[in-house]
Amino acid sequence: MEELIAIVGPTAVGKTELAVAWARRINGEIVSADSRQIYRWMDIGTAKPSPEEQAQAPHHLIDIRDPDQPFSLAEFCDLATAAIADIRGRGRIPLLVGGTGQYLAAFLEGWQVPRVAPQPDLRAELELIAAREGPAVLHARLAAVDPVAASRIPPTNVRRVVRALEVYLVSGEPISRLQERKEPPFRPRTIWLHRPRAELYARADARIERMIAAGLVEEVAGLLARGYDWSLPAMSSLGYIQFRPYFTGEADLPTCIERLRFDTHAFIRRQEMWFRRLPNLEIWTPDHPSWREITA
């Protein structure tokens, strides 16, 4: 069974720098495990690898959907599997790189991801219940039919609650049963890039400043001008939804930027909760000999 190297870590930890340098050393190619870098025209806010970085090492699963096109966990697993097979078939080495915890867990742990297609009308109906009656009411419905899933999904995560109910109502099977795992066809070697929390926050704040200077607000305006509205999952992404009050006239720009900082710090904490559960973890800090050698 072949080894699969996965480089994981929270936003702003330094994944791209390490991954590109490592790929260049080992004749490798990068398979992105980022649920937002799949979208075209969303470059700055998603911290997408630059054209220069992508030129140094081939990247897969980046810029594969428009912001109004759906993309599921099952599609990610299928496309990542195909990309890894293609890379290996050409005698090169795949590196799975990203920070989307659910994508990483599903792929590395061998989840059997439900193949239930999105049902827009049903989703809208369930979302309306959450909006009118509160997320707790919707979560209680999930608990009644799939208590295992309900124990794993907080009531505040309306999107995942809706998806779990959607799967049950369409397939008749609880999503928790459909997500039972089997051994993946590779040996995962999961490298968690780790920095102290205060350092991560400072790096994230500095990156936000660079994003603003690079034209993040203009990027959001461009997406709106293309007709992509705030109801789309892509537009709810970190780095985009925080600017909605600015464009609707409800808040000034500094307030929205401060909200982005706050939400990014919270996102880092959630990411780290996912990483702790991944298989075969190696924790690398910046003074780890391999990290230093690869990026030297």
UniProtKB/Swiss-Prot annotation:
Residues that hold substrate according to the record: T11, A12, V13, G14, K15, T16
Gene Ontology terms, MF aspect: ATP binding; tRNA dimethylallyltransferase activity
Residues in coiled coil: none
Residues given in the record as ATP binding sites: G9, P10, T11, A12, V13, G14, K15, T16
Region (Interaction with substrate tRNA): 34-37
Gene Ontology biological process terms, A to Z: tRNA modification
Cofactor (UniProt): Mg(2+)
Catalytic activity annotation: adenosine(37) in tRNA + dimethylallyl diphosphate = N(6)-dimethylallyladenosine(37) in tRNA + diphosphate
Keywords: ATP-binding, Magnesium, Nucleotide-binding, Transferase, tRNA processing
EC number in record: 2.5.1.75
Record flagged with keyword Repeat: no
Broad class of enzyme this protein falls into: transferase
This protein's record includes keyword Transcription: no
Family label: Belongs to the IPP transferase family.
Subunit structure: Monomer.
Function description: Catalyzes the transfer of a dimethylallyl group onto the adenine at position 37 in tRNAs that read codons beginning with uridine, leading to the formation of N6-(dimethylallyl)adenosine (i(6)A).
Name assigned to this protein: tRNA dimethylallyltransferase
Source organism of this protein record: Chloroflexus aurantiacus (strain ATCC 29366 / DSM 635 / J-10-fl)
Gene from which this protein is expressed: miaA
